[in-house]
Amino acid sequence: MSSPRPSTSSTSSDSGLSVDTTAYPEESKYTSTAPGAGGLSDENRYRDVEEGEAGADEPFLPSAKKQAASGSRTSRLIWGLVILCVAGWLWGLVLFVTQNRSAQQSVSEALQSHESGAISGSSSSGKPVTLEQVLTGQWLPRSHAVSWIAGPNGEDGLLVEQGEDQGKGYLRVDDIRSRKGDATSQESRVLMEKAIVQVDGRTIFPVSTWPSPNLNKVLLLSEREKNWRHSFTGKYWIFDVATQTAQPLDPSNPDGRVQLAIWSPTSDMVAFVRDNNLYLRRLSSKEVVPITKDGGADLFYGIPDWVYEEEVFSGNSVTWWSGDGKYVAFLRTNETAVPEFPVQYYLSRPSGKRPPPGLEDYPEVREIKYPKAGAPNPVVSLQFYDVEKQEVFSIEAPDDFEDDDRIVIEIVWGTEGKILVRATNRESDVLKVFLFDTKARTSKLVRTENVADIDGGWVEPTQYTWFIPADPSNGRPHDGYLDTVIHEGYEHLGYFTPLDNSEPILLTQGEWEVVDAPTAVDLRKGIVYFISTKESPTERHLYQVNLDGSNLKPLTDTSKPGYYDVSFSHGTGYALLSYRGPSIPWQAIVNTETDELKYEETIEDNAGLARMVDSYALPTEIYQNVTIDGFTLQVVERRPPHFNPAKKYPVLFYLYNGPRSQTVDRKFSIDFQSYVASSLGYIVVTVDGRGTGFSGRKTRCIVRGNLGYYEAYDQITTANLWGEKPYVDETRMSIWGWSYGGFMTLKTLEQDAGQTFQYGMAVAPVTDWRHYDSIYTERYMHTPAHNPNGYDNTSITDMTALQQTVRFLVIHGASDDNVHIQNTLVLVDKLDLAGVQNYDLHFYPDSDHSINFHNAHRMVYERLSSWLVNAFNDEWHRIADPVPDDSMWEKVKRSLPMLVN
């Protein structure tokens, strides 16, 4: 990480922490301060969240009045016993009433007795954040996705807008230059007048639209049905802009469900996939030409299978048109050897099929081809379709990986039939880049990187390689491409030219990293735009650099913390710049033609969100870092409103901590963690431990082969540091996470064995990496055959250690197609065998990894909230070892409800 900017921060030592002490307005994401706050005294500035209530160490006892001397020792003894009995009865009554009232109140009502007072970042009369607001998205910033599109003749600054807008039509192409005034550009046009379309007497309600490159046609999708996370099926239609009429994509099969449809660059053809076969529709006729014919349950053409969709492409397409429309490249995926995993649905029918009569009460079972770690992977190969010759062909690659050891991660078309193919071995630590020539039908290996030898790490399956065509008049005599390369322990931009050159021109370097780069390239000016962490691992700023590596400079304000992303117009003359935090997010269209960004139009200022911030008592976020074993790790601490440093607060740790992930960043966010701090009054801490991204390869790659060990150590060490703080109650500490965070919760509790964390909440956890999919798992763990000890070490196996915690909670969706319920069931069996009972378990029927079937999503968070309150109220201590009690005291307690009611 680069040093903090001296103008805004300094570094100090606090309990072994290296702390970023930036002034509050830049420390917190929220800068709304109530008027008059500065006039409060130190005594009044901090208010106890539960001020006025009896503290845990100050039990309510009635004051004893001095009794007159009776002269009789017996009398004094009797009166003393009577007083003690009455006092005991009153104490029991108080406890019962308090507990009964607490049980009847909601979690928020029970714990949000805030005293009014102003602090930095919170309104003096502010209301606490509610769970309802978080779950219904009321705190989400408004944002707009701009769909930039190239004009038919390469015009720049055009964008597609969908939705009724003051009679301007449903689907429009607008010229950004005409939006500021009343003038209408020649390039602005209406593509669809209305949101509904009539086709042969049928009413079509499009849910998605894709204009053709020449803007004369629009591809429409209706009746969309979800498949997996990114994939779906639907019915497709071709809409004619001139006549405002539509026809089926396949006139001979209008009701056929299509899995993918893509325009050709020449706007006269559509490639589409149905029933796992690839087809071509020429708009000049109604005929549909099958490109492949043997697709089916085990063979996929043009679309990914489950594991490639989830772990490689994060999308539903593995079909790529060449720029001139003469070729279609696509992947052939053979799943024949991949084992199946059954996912059961007890209430729903994802297939849409009714069961046969008499079988209505049986669950629907969906058999998914799911390769677990060590199991056979799908065999993937690249094929091509010559549009003119109407033939499918393949090109053999020299020095290619074997079929069972190949993962194709990216395809990039160049010019003149050239195509770059990036592939890795099964364990994702050797990268090979091939150059194919579809005209000559030849190929060669142009680059190999053995990442295992470089730093012991892995190759992430990203798709950001950018082809740079030759332009001798502009200083580019040869074709080339931009790719991310490892340089001195950090990921930077490299420019490879000619295409077969294996040594790049470094465009960036230093102890920081580029992120999903490049973002855009201005070929006319020879400028590369990219987002990076140059200022801080938790920030994102926009930069530009020339193709020769000169003139690197920021385009966003780096004088203060910021988190930006950007999307450029087709010609890079304009961009949608999105500021995500730490202050109120905004979006603006900017002009990039000048040396400095010129703001053309603000399209979102989130004024409503700003008003909410002024009205609510939000947590204060303190960004810090800790140094553990020489590694600098980013931390954010969320303090409750009216934070009182003299009070002892419970602490909840929230984590994800998956490889290359990031949770601690400067984006504006009001989420479940914010609710816990604001409404429940607890401190919430997140530390991005080793293995997470954007702090260099050394920090990231150390976890390879032993997931969970260093990450858990970092959580425990940080929790111990927090436990030493005077305002932290080290006897009430919990940790929670979802998915990889669920695994990390259990792994941390296992490694800690109750020494630091008393509680934990794990949602949809992996408990044994042999149960998770091969491509993700083996990237970080190698194969089970290669690393058997690593798999043993990283599994949740020490039930005795889990028994040392006070209590933990495990939640899982019963129909999770990603992290199978098998993970939790295997864990439960281990707990049963060990006789461990200090846990709670809840399953949600028919819910996948997101747990949202029926009312499940709300119920998950309500359960997490109430369970956490019970934990920090010491309820789990009370029920740890239940025994029958028929004493007189218990009988009196059981009689109290009648007296109360």
Swiss-Prot record:
EC number(s) given by UniProt: 3.4.14.5
Glycosylation, residue list: N334, N625, N793
GO biological process: proteolysis
Topological category with respect to the lipid bilayer: Single-pass type II membrane protein
Alphabetized GO MF terms: aminopeptidase activity; dipeptidyl-peptidase activity; serine-type peptidase activity
Comp. bias (Low complexity): 1-22
Catalytic activity: Release of an N-terminal dipeptide, Xaa-Yaa-|-Zaa-, from a polypeptide, preferentially when Yaa is Pro, provided Zaa is neither Pro nor hydroxyproline
Active site (UniProt): S739, D816, H849
Subcellular location: Vacuole membrane
Cytoplasmic side: 1-76
Vacuolar-side segments: 98-901
Transmembrane parts of this sequence: 77-97
Keyword field: Aminopeptidase, Glycoprotein, Hydrolase, Membrane, Protease, Serine protease, Signal-anchor, Transmembrane, Transmembrane helix, Vacuole
Region (Disordered): 1-67
InterPro entries (UniProt xref): AB_hydrolase_fold, Peptidase_S9_cat, Peptidase_S9B_N, Serine_Prot_S9B/DPPIV
Main localization (coarse): membrane
An annotated GO cellular component: vacuolar membrane
General function of this protein: Type IV dipeptidyl-peptidase which removes N-terminal dipeptides sequentially from polypeptides having unsubstituted N-termini provided that the penultimate residue is proline.
Family: Belongs to the peptidase S9B family.
PANTHER family in the record: DIPEPTIDYL PEPTIDASE 10, ISOFORM B, PROTEASE FAMILY S9B,C DIPEPTIDYL-PEPTIDASE IV-RELATED
Name of the protein this chain belongs to: Dipeptidyl-aminopeptidase B
